[in-house]
Amino acid sequence: MTTLLVLTNLPDRANADRLADSLVERRLAACVNILAPCRSAYRWKGAVQHDEEHPMLIKTTAERYSALEAAIRAMHPY
């Protein structure tokens, strides 16, 4: 069994909690760590933007990665 650590960022704690609960409940993740908010810089519509995000570390297996990715894409707000 190959273990993976997946990183994603959510815009707020409520979305992070909702996604974490869903992934663990559906057994797509063994554990999810919601980290302290951080400040992200990125380019959007031709300008550099800055926003606060909540990083998430998601522990899963290679066998469950495809289903995990699909769940994140379905629930992620951006």
Name each model-derived stretch.
Residues 1-78:
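Positively charged, small/polar-rich N-terminal and surface patches that mediate targeting and assembly
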